[in-house]
């Protein structure tokens, strides 16, 4: 979803003349929506199973990353305007963008507690979910829509920060927060702390030069996931 939103913003930059940053939110929303639609179509025949959705998402992320790299390699001067945003940065976030994103986030996060039962039962497996009367396909689609909207809103504000979204739930689980709502709350808080820490390091480590928070979080996250893989293999 974040890669689709990023590609939508970059494509808008090439199509809209002049100062196109006012179209950032609509372009990112369209990119995220198109990405979500493709994932739903690709995984629909399998009953929207997590594995099929994961594979479809990985394939789309790879495709969008390749297209973004091609646009960067083209040498177009317009890419320089948005290169920092693609790297995941708070530098270009304006007060109006933060306010708009904050309002959307509050509305979406208010829906999360209503889905607590779904998120508690789904990890137990499809058979268990059906046994308690849960409709698997509509439930998975609804949760995917909610997650996609939350991801797109964050991406349009500060750019793609995939590793923060990957690290935070694992860290929260390692801290002992395994029940659904405590895990979600702690994941959000942990992700915020990681972002603030990466942003602070990016501004201070090579001062007066600045490193985007997305690059630093990836630098931190890659060794962390290697550590997790080694730990699980043992």
Regions found by a protein language model. Name each.
Residues 1-234:
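Alpha-helical transmembrane segments in inner-membrane proteins
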């Amino acid at each position: 979803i974040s890669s689709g939103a990023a590609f939508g913003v970059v494509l808008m930059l090439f199509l809209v003349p002049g100062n196109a940053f006012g179209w950032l939110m609509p372009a990112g929303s369209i990119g995220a929506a198109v990405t979500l639609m493709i994932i739903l179509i690709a995984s629909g025949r399998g009953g929207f199973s997590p594995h099929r959705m994961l594979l479809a998402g990985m394939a789309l992320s790879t495709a969008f990353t390749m297209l973004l790299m091609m646009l960067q390699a083209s040498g177009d001067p317009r890419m320089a305007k948005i290169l920092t945003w693609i790297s995941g940065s708070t530098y270009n976030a304006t007060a109006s963008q933060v306010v708009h994103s904050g309002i959307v986030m509050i509305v979406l996060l208010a829906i999360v507690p209503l889905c607590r039962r779904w998120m508690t039962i789904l990890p137990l497996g499809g058979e268990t979910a059906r046994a308690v009367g849960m409709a698997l396909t509509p439930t998975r689609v609804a949760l995917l829509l909610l997650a996609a909207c939350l991801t797109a809103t964050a991406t349009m504000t500060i750019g793609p920060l995939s590793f923060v979204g990957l690290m935070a739930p694992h860290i929260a689980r390692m801290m002992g927060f395994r029940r659904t709502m405590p895990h979600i709350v702690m994941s959000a808080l942990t992700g915020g702390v990681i972002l603030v820490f990466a942003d602070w390091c990016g501004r201070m480590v090579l001062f007066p030069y600045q490193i985007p928070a997305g690059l630093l979080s990836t630098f931190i996250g890659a060794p962390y996931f290697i550590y997790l893989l080694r730990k699980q293999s043992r």
